[in-house]
UniProtKB/Swiss-Prot annotation:
Name of the protein: Mitochondrial import inner membrane translocase subunit tim22
Transmembrane segments: 8-28, 54-74, 150-170
Lineage, highest ranks first: Eukaryota, Fungi, Dikarya, Ascomycota, Pezizomycotina
Biological process, per Gene Ontology: protein insertion into mitochondrial inner membrane
Family: Belongs to the Tim17/Tim22/Tim23 family.
Superkingdom of origin organism: Eukaryota
Intrachain S-S bonds: C49-C126, C145-C164
Chief localisation class: mitochondrion
Key words, A-Z: Disulfide bond, Membrane, Mitochondrion, Mitochondrion inner membrane, Protein transport, Translocation, Transmembrane, Transmembrane helix, Transport
Length: 184
């Protein structure tokens, strides 16, 4: 089977590490001009800011939905609180119905929030990288500050400043960790 970007068979001695895996030094040998043009178009599309933003927003939405569902399933009402006592007095079916309704609403809320944060940060980082024409740690700090500031802006200037500082620090820490050389 001929898959663009993959070599067939075993890699010869002296080949680059990872040869035979998609995008790992295989190049476009053995592909027709049409296949090469298609691969280049796919790479160009994946590098565009709108596509990166949509992908990050979609992945954030999915992850947020799963996270919200998990967190809602872990929360429980104690029978020692007035709300817990009221729920425990309901019939079993009503308890289950309310539980699923709560799980759905929390899942939807988390999905929206994660999707917005993912799309906003990814889009901002892509634009900053394009404007600076560099791929370094500063892009993450600038993008984190802009994203945190936008997310905190509704709560006032102090919240926007705190969001800027917090999100920038978190983004810098994650990006610095991701850029560390692997121990191979």
């Amino acid at each position: 089977m001929n898959i663009p970007g993959m070599t067939t068979g075993m890699a010869p001695a002296g080949a680059t590490a990872g040869a035979g895996f998609p995008g790992a030094g295989a190049g476009m040998q053995g592909m027709s001009e049409q296949e090469q043009a298609m691969v280049k178009a796919m790479h160009a599309a994946m590098e565009s800011c709108p596509v990166k933003t949509v992908i990050s927003g979609t992945m954030g939405f999915g992850l947020g939905g799963v996270f919200g569902l998990f967190m809602a399933s872990m929360s429980y009402d104690s029978t020692f609180t007035p709300q817990g006592k009221a729920i425990m007095d309901l019939p079993w079916r009503e308890q289950v119905r309310r539980g699923f309704k709560d799980m759905g609403s929390r899942s939807w809320s988390s999905a929206k929030n994660f999707g917005i944060v993912g799309a906003l940060y990814s889009g901002t980082e892509c634009c900053v990288e394009g404007l600076r024409a560099k791929n370094d740690l500063s892009n993450s700090v600038i993008s984190g500050c802009i994203t945190g500031g936008i997310l905190g802006a509704k709560a006032g200037p102090q919240a926007a400043a705190a969001g800027c500082a917090g999100f920038a620090a978190f983004s810098a820490a994650i990006d610095a960790y991701m850029r560390m050389p692997s121990e191979e």
